């Protein structure tokens, strides 16, 4: 067994897969539904090849688009319970994302639990968004909000609740996951508890 011979056997016991299917199909086959996609948003601000816009402009556009679609299902910005931040722990990204969250959620931004699971996984590049969406589904299912580990000395300009150091329990019905990329590419997806 090539995988076990290289010591990777345990890696394959801890994986996630997202299956996206229509509600009627999932219900007909008796699938366990971990969450329902409320909406998504994408933007490309093309501000800089590697740096995000300092005001979070492009990120805010993607988040607003996702929220706009969620509002069609009766979900308001004040109902967002958890955000899985892009959170790469770089000064420009974290400050820009903080500003974007504040622009989009207003005062509610201070009530939302936020964490960066990249603090535990590292940056998974093209796989990051899928894993972080799966994390959001598990947060909805379990009510366990993962921590942002190693957040000992947060930047004073990043003053939201980034769930430092320890996981917390909370009732979570609506989540948002942010993914930003080089060249100003921004994406946001929102999930909610299936009822």
PLM regions and their residue ranges:
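Single conserved hydrophobic/aromatic residue that forms the stacking wall/gate
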Residues: 1-12
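Short glycine/serine- and small hydrophobic-enriched flexible loop segments
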Residues: 3, 21-24, 65, 134-141
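Acyl-CoA/ACP chain-elongation machinery
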Residues: 6, 40-54, 87-94, 111-161
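Channel- or pocket-lining gating/hinge segments that regulate access to a cavity or pore
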Residues: 10-34
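Short beta-strand-to-turn element immediately C-terminal to the catalytic PLP-Schiff-base lysine
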Residues: 18-22, 93, 190-194
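Conserved small-residue
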Residues: 19, 37, 80, 85-86, ...
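Phosphate/pyrophosphate-binding loops at sites that engage ATP/ADP/AMP, CoA/4′-phosphopantetheine
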Residues: 25-30, 63-82, 104-108
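Flexible, low-complexity linker/loop segments at domain and module junctions
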Residues: 73-77, 110, 159-195
């Amino acid at each position: 067994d090539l995988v076990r011979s290289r010591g990777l056997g345990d890696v394959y016991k801890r994986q996630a897969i997202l299956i996206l299917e229509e509600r009627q199909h999932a219900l007909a086959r008796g699938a366990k539904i971990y969450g329902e996609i409320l909406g998504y948003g994408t933007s490309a601000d093309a501000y800089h090849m590697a740096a995000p816009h300092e005001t979070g402009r492009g990120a805010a556009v993607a988040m607003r688009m996702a929220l706009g679609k969620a509002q069609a299902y009766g979900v308001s910005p004040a109902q967002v319970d958890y955000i899985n931040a892009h959170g790469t722990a770089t000064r420009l990204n974290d400050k820009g994302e903080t500003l974007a969250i504040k622009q989009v959620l207003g005062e509610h931004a201070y009530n939302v639990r936020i964490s960066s699971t990249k603090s535990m996984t590292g940056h998974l590049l093209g796989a990051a968004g899928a894993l972080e969406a799966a994390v959001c589904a598990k947060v909805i299912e379990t009510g366990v909000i993962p921590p942002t580990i190693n957040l000992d000395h947060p930047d004073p300009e990043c003053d939201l609740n980034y769930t430092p150091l320890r996981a917390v329990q909370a009732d979570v019905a609506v989540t948002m996951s942010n993914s930003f990329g080089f060249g100003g590419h921004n994406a946001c997806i929102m999930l909610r508890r299936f009822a």
